[in-house]
Amino acid sequence: MAGPSRAPVKKQASLTSFFTANISSKKHANSPGGGSAANRNKDETEDENTQKIIGKGKEKDESSPITLSVLESNRKRPLQDNNSNGNGRSSRAAKRAKSVVSEDDSEEVSSPPVQASTGRTPIPEPPSSSSRTERYAYDADRLASDPSGLNEDEDAATRRKKEELHRKFVKKLGHPDSLASLRRRELLGQNESPGLDGEGEEEGGDAEEDETPLPSKTKKKGAKTGKLTPMEIQFLDIKRKHMDTVLVVEVGYKFRFFGEDARIAAKELSIVCIPGKFRYDEPHIDRFASASIPVHRLSVHVKRLVAAGHKVGVVRQLETAALKKAGDNRNAPFVRKLTNIYTKGTYIDETGELDQPGEGAGASAGGYLLCLTESPVKGLGTDENVHIGVMAVQPATGDIIYDDFEDGFMRREIETRLLHISPCELLVVGELSKATNKLVQHLAGSSTNVFGDRSRVERVPKSKTMAAEASSHVTQFYAGKVKGDDERSASLLDKVLKLPESVTVCLSAMITHLTEYGLEHIFDLTKYFQSFTTRQHMLINGTTLESLEVYRNATDQSEKGSLLWALDKTRTRPGRRLLRKWIGRPLLDRERLEERVTAVEELLEHQSNFKVDRLGGVLNSIKADLERSLIRIYYGKCTRPELLSTLQTLQRISIEFSRVKTPEDTGFNSSLIVEAIYALPGIGTIVSAYLDKINPEAARKDDKYTFFRDDEETEDITNHKLGIAAVEADLDVHRKDAATKLSKKTPVTYVTVSGIEYLIEVPNTDLKHVPASWAKISGTKKLSRFHTPEVMRLMNERDQHKEALAAACDNAFTDLLKSIASEYQPLRDAVASLATLDCLLSLAQVASLPGYSKPTFLPTATPPTISITSGRHPIAEHTLPDGYIPFTTSLASPSPLAQLITGPNMGGKSSYVRAVALLVLLAQIGSYVPAEAMSLTLTDAIYTRMGARDNLFAGESTFMVEVSETAAILRGATARSLVVLDELGRGTSTHDGAAIAHAVLAHVARETRCLTLFITHYQNLARVADGLGGAVRCVHMRFEATGRQRDEAADGDADAAAADADEEITFLYEVADGVAHRSYGLNVARLARIPRRVLDVAARKSREMEEGVKARRLRGAVRLLEDVVAGGGGGGGGGGGDGDDGEDPLEHLVSSIEQL
């Protein structure tokens, strides 16, 4: 039972008390006479039956427990026991602590007593069963005589109290989630709310406890945050500064998640989340929800969280147990600090990276972190043309791409760059226009987007003076890196200062952003700054990448079935990344292109030679991702086993080519191969110098203590090792002292049990000899194990030396990484050379396939030309079981500049034009092509308008997408571009679509004069070809029609329609001159298993419409013939002008007759 309190205690009322008419006052606590005047007045109003039963005066009733019991049963209302000291305590306090419904019999309702009762004996407590039954009885007579139940002095105070209790009741149990909240408290083992027992609470404690604490660092008295552990408070301090980060906190031998982070981790990692509060201001729960993972699985789980799109922070303990015990803060929690932050674009801490091919259908993104900023172009609307600056960084390789350009309202330019770069994370500086913002959300927001995975988007504000601030920030960043007359540093700063303003803004934002991750030093490598729009490469926009399936197929967005999949025979990861760049950026520099093709040719000719086999063997032996390992060394994030593997791999490569002293020693003639091989032996000296410092066995086992050879250890490492040796020697000497105390003649022997070292075993029969100062650690039935005070002291000293040694070893390893990072440039050049050799060998392997030939590049002065003999689709021939039917075609200026391609549905028109475009692309990346022969001039861009799709995110219909892409082509195409237009105009009515197709074909043939492949089902466009002076050539995809012929059935009857429906088409997939006047759509409908009745109706309607068109053409031809005859007869004696006027109608007549 709790002792009496020194102050009046404010207690939580029972839930049942809220339903009584009034709570009785304490009759005898406020006056020496046993009750207040108000109470005596109330007693005088008792009914007559009560007075008869009592049979005595009021004073006697108060002192008789039996009479009191009878009184309570008849009064039918609560009655409080007398309590002379007013402390509000009774003998039933223990029972109240176990029940929420039970209540203290002496609960204080009115104001505290002014004077304690003296000389009155406390009344014994009635039996609890009758008390619970009778104390809440309802007395209607009492209400009739005194509706308030209180005197005037107590009325206001009691009303306030009851209103406060009612408010608490409604707050706790008056909402739909109240029962669920109680169940969760039961689940947490909190069957009783703190504060219901009323013990030790201060005035106003209840009200504060029920209120939700504000998320501030100051803790209210009685608030739940006051019950957090010191470690949880430490977690909150870090979380407040990183609210957007999932924190993984090191706690002993585990890493733990707390609060909302635990729920996220449980969902993404499929681990258990222990229930608790998910927010630090959540009421009624005094501990956080949590989840945990083992220390050795940290990298695996962090990688999974990052891949899911989360920003993850790792909070580590910066103190060890031994050093903390020896320090001044031994009673404080471990010091913890946020040491690492990871996102998709900055995660490079493990050898298994995020951009490796995944298990899903979609290929992964390119590993770039892309920053973009936008500003409106002066004089235009806010959503029209905009000026955009972009900078993309690949932290794992050190590559940096930047660009500055103006974009139209369709945002084709920024879309092209996003599709080329495929960023896994975007940093948006400032506000974006509505159109740009929708594009970014569309490309990055879906888990099945064109990037292959959901991309993370982060936004930072942009001030009005951002340009000036960015310039100053970038200048200061690089100014500290310029050292005296260092020419390299000076050129670095000069190159950065020449960047466009919008790119400088992006660079400043990226420096600030990557500083948080410790990766800002990547911008020191300005050698790898590349402009996206340098005219050394062919322009391939985003639409073309998708239409030609360059990186991903159009079916499931996976890499299989793409051009990259068909060409990728690389052996190393740096080689694969370089090949991807080559495919996306074909060359325009003829000299570089010839150099690359010549290298592929030489490797192909000597593919069975020892030299080529050795190159392949060296590349096959490279298992590590050297490019990423080097950048991890540069960042200081490399592990010891990885460092050993990287250095040994580089040494093995240098030894393999150690005999190469001059370019002639390489054994190749191609300058590209010679330069690549000649760069490899030079790294041998650098790598060997660092390997000589390392103990290979220790590095392989990740043993930091013996990682360095003895003569390469630092002074700190040596001192701490000597200190450990000295302590261990003292422990050995101490064995004799221990034996002396145990009355033994021979020194005791230390044993290790369950990881506890230096235990002294003593048989239980000899325990009488053990000094009292020895600490028993463990034991069995026969013996006990002890630590002496000296052993404990020496072990603590040894542990301190060990932990200091570990820190010294880590510092020495960090210094070694910094030293290797100073040699990053030559090592990176060597890895780049290996990647080049890998790509060339891959292209040579492709060239060795049957039917591949070397393309011939025509002189620059030659008019635009593409000539292909027996060409094949480079992707389809690998996927089709029966192979691909070759085609022969040519485009040339002045004629034929364009081809008008017709043919039946599914006849191979789209496959043919894609094959031509892909062969041009292959030729200009330096690859052999699947054709008997191919000659071409360099093409500066490939534009495509293929397929039918809408653009909901931009509010564009299918036809709007068609004409918008066509407009962009007409604006950007030059005389040296290749344009592919597939069924332009099909998104609108026949007349409008044919008119647009007519106009566009005429424009590209007469105005732009670019090489064009134009697919259409509008056969009347053949007239345009005839009227363009041979610039357009009509071709069609050959086919054979079999089955009942139309002339076998009577015209217009059902048999004729059935003949159309039954007619079968055999596709020959060959290109031939001429126009196909029918598309045979019913044949495709039949292959798609359209119901027979529907096909019959469609055939009949098709025949009716076709005959109607023929009839109109025939009538028109007759009228035209009459006009020609009439004009010829009337104008026989006229001048030459009449003859000229008659030429056009005559030609029109001939064309009409041909179409009949």
UniProtKB/Swiss-Prot annotation:
Protein name per UniProt: DNA mismatch repair protein MSH3
Composition bias type Basic and acidic residues, residue spans: 132-144
Annotated region (Mispair-binding domain), positions in chain: 225-345
Subunit architecture: Heterodimer consisting of MSH2-MSH3 (MutS beta). Forms a ternary complex with MutL alpha (MLH1-PMS1).
Gene name of this polypeptide: MSH3
Binding-site list for ATP: G903, P904, N905, M906, G907, G908, K909, S910
Entry's Gene Ontology BP terms: mismatch repair; mitotic recombination
Protein keywords: ATP-binding, DNA damage, DNA repair, DNA-binding, Nucleotide-binding, Nucleus
InterPro entries noted in UniProt: DNA_mismatch_repair_MutS-lik_N (IPR007695), DNA_mismatch_repair_MutS/MSH (IPR017261), DNA_mismatch_repair_MutS_C (IPR000432), DNA_mismatch_repair_MutS_core (IPR007696), DNA_mismatch_repair_MutS_N (IPR016151), DNA_mismatch_repair_MutS_sf (IPR036187), DNA_mmatch_repair_MutS_con_dom (IPR007860), MutS (IPR045076)
Coiled-coil ranges per UniProt: none
Function: Component of the post-replicative DNA mismatch repair system (MMR). Heterodimerizes with MSH2 to form MutS beta, which binds to DNA mismatches thereby initiating DNA repair. MSH3 provides substrate-binding and substrate specificity to the complex. When bound, the MutS beta heterodimer bends the DNA helix and shields approximately 20 base pairs. Acts mainly to repair insertion-deletion loops (IDLs) from 2 to 13 nucleotides in size, but can also repair base-base and single insertion-deletion mismatches that occur during replication.
Cellular-component GO terms for this entry: nucleus
Any one GO MF annotation of this record: ATP binding
Xref: Pfam families: MutS_I, MutS_II, MutS_III, MutS_V
Subcellular location: Nucleus
Species in which this protein is naturally found: Chaetomium globosum (strain ATCC 6205 / CBS 148.51 / DSM 1962 / NBRC 6347 / NRRL 1970) (Soil fungus)
Chain intervals with Gly residues compositional bias: 1126-1137
Ranges of biased composition (kind: Low complexity): 82-91
Homology family: Belongs to the DNA mismatch repair MutS family. MSH3 subfamily.
Spans annotated as Disordered: 22-163, 188-225, 1125-1156
